[in-house]
Design a protein with these regions (language model features):
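Core catalytic DNA strand-manipulation module of type IA topoisomerases
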Residues: 1-168
Length: 168
């Protein structure tokens, strides 16, 4: 699944470890005497979000991150289908965006917090503005035109979704 691939590349978690941790986050973690499911069903590669989730995400972005990070319209990824995707369910996301990874860290193991942070930030960033870069290219050619060297680089101008979903 996409979750397993992303957890492997970003966190170094194996597929079964990822799913065991996700299962626990889905079934519930005890927070202040109450067992709370922190993520939606995790055995899916679905990309659609419920209207309520989108509304909650957009309100959170506007109020907690900044209006400049909020696209004019909600972003929809339902047309993008992964090969062999299991899409009967909504995309994996936090059940309540207000439960930030930092706010519930003390209730989670280190690995649970890492995976929850990945799910939380990836889901929320899906409704944020794109990052903006300036791309520069320099070409140097020798006097006799025998040798040409080209170098390109990008400079981040606006962090957009990268503000919370770091590209590590």
């Amino acid at each position: 699944s996409t979750l397993q691939q992303t957890a492997s590349s970003r966190l170094g978690f194996g597929a079964s470890r990822t799913m065991q941790i996700a299962q626990k986050l889905y079934q519930g973690i005890e927070i202040e005497g109450e067992t709370i499911g922190l993520i939606t069903y995790m055995r899916t590669d679905g990309t659609n979000l419920s209207k309520d989730a989108i509304s909650d995400f957009r309100n959170y972005i506007k109020n907690e991150i900044g209006n400049e990070y909020l696209p004019e319209n909600a972003l929809n990824y339902s047309g993008k289908k992964a090969k062999n995707a299991q899409e009967a369910h909504e995309a994996i996301r936090p059940t309540d965006i207000i439960r930030t990874p930092q706010s519930i860290k003390k209730y989670l193991s280190t690995d649970q917090n890492k995976l929850y942070d990945l799910i939380w930030s990836r889901a929320l960033s899906s409704q944020m503005e794109s990052a903006k870069f300036d791309r520069n290219t320099i070409t140097i050619t020798s006097d006799n035109s025998d040798t040409t060297c080209k170098a390109s680089g990008s400079v981040l101008k606006f962090d957009g979704f990268l503000k919370i979903y770091k590209n590590t």
